[in-house]
Design a protein with these regions (language model features):
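Bacterial N-terminal signal peptides that target proteins for export
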Residues: 1-9
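Bacterial N-terminal signal peptides
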Residues: 8-17
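Acidic, polar-rich low-complexity tracts and alpha-helical solenoid repeat scaffolds
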Residues: 20-336
């Protein structure tokens, strides 16, 4: 143990043993975390009536003193939770947390407000505020830990759940159709295409009387099926579903500006169906696990599908050649 360490040890011990007054300036408040408050300073913002306490919170918020706003608003909620002033206090808590960029905590406080005080006059505004918060997370904002202070990760799953809460809070509110679409967008961004399709389907069905929303839902529904089809080379069902979805979109919204793009997508998907069937036919023909008869039968089925889908495709000639080569082998299989 060197002399420097011994010296530091005695300094720390000396300071620790000094008598001093500790008015416990560090205080923890649920939702706020730890904050510093010198002894006696709370007299500046505490009041004995809910109305007066809320006025302190309002004035502090107006002056961008969010720390005092939170203290005063939380006091209203703690001391007078059933008063007429509690909903506004809860609202101010959410607003302060937003201003401090603690969006996840703000969202939760707004959620608590809607559950505890469902008749609040700010209901629609709060839904829109929740929507804007969710949009920020959709745009890549990080979720935080340690009472909302440390940004750590992005999550489209948690973002989609936020949009889901907004829809559940008011399924037929003005913001709900947009939030429902965003559930699909978040799931799509997360490459959870099955969940995305379901979300878009819900939007198109529930808000069918809102043409802008319904059209957007149907179009994005078709796009999501198309994305699935590119990842399912041996399952041409997704391409067929995408074609059907685009066709429905064109039928229901023939004047939509995206019809031309939908028609082009259908053409591409049909070409992809042909290519996919050809790939599956080759898979059967070259399989090492199937019997010779199974390989030839399977290959012929899918080569025929290539011709049925488009007899003039770039794959058609080769498909015909392979059918002509395989059929005689089925009738007269070579001796094993």
């Amino acid at each position: 143990m060197n002399r420097r360490f011994i010296f530091l040890f005695f300094i720390v011990a000396f300071v620790g043993l000094l008598p001093f007054r500790s008015p416990a300036p560090l205080i923890y408040a649920p939702g706020e975390g730890w904050y510093y408050e010198p002894a006696g300073s709370n007299a500046k913002w505490t009041r004995t009536r809910a109305k007066d306490q809320l006025e302190v919170a309002e004035e502090a918020f107006k002056n961008q003193d969010y720390s005092t706003t939170l203290h005063a608003a939380y006091r209203v909620l703690k001391v007078w939770p059933l008063s007429d002033y509690a909903p506004r206090a809860q609202y101010l808590v959410g607003r302060c947390l937003e201003m401090e960029h603690r969006d996840e905590a703000a969202f939760d406080k707004y959620q608590d407000l809607l559950k505890k005080y469902p008749r609040t006059d700010s209901y629609d505004e709060i839904l829109w505020r929740q929507y804007e918060i969710a949009n920020r997370f959709y745009g890549g904002q990080f979720f935080r830990i340690f009472w909302g202070y440390l940004p750590l990760y992005t999550s489209m799953d948690e973002t989609a759940k936020m949009y889901g809460k907004i829809v559940n809070n008011g399924p037929y509110s003005d913001v709900a159709p947009h939030a429902q679409l965003q559930i699909g967008a978040a799931r799509e961004k997360d490459k959870d295409y099955e969940a995305a399709v379901k979300a878009y389907e819900t939007a198109a069905d529930r808000y069918h009387n809102q043409p802008v929303i319904a059209a957007d839902a149907m179009y994005r529904w078709a796009i999501t099926y198309q994305k699935q089809s590119t990842k399912a080379e041996y399952d041409q069902g997704k391409a067929g579903q995408a074609i059907a979805a685009y066709t429905d979109f064109i039928t229901v919204f023939p004047d939509d500006k995206r019809v031309a793009a939908a028609q082009q997508a259908i053409t591409m998907l049909k070409a992809e169906q042909v290519r996919g069937s050809f790939v599956v036919a080759q898979f059967y023909e070259n399989s090492k696990t199937l019997s010779a008869t199974q390989r030839r039968n399977g290959a012929i089925v899918y080569y025929n599908e290539v011709l049925q889908l488009n007899p003039n495709s770039p794959y058609a000639a080769q498909a015909r050649q392979r059918i002509e080569a395989l059929k005689p082998l089925l009738q007269n299989p070579p001796a094993s």
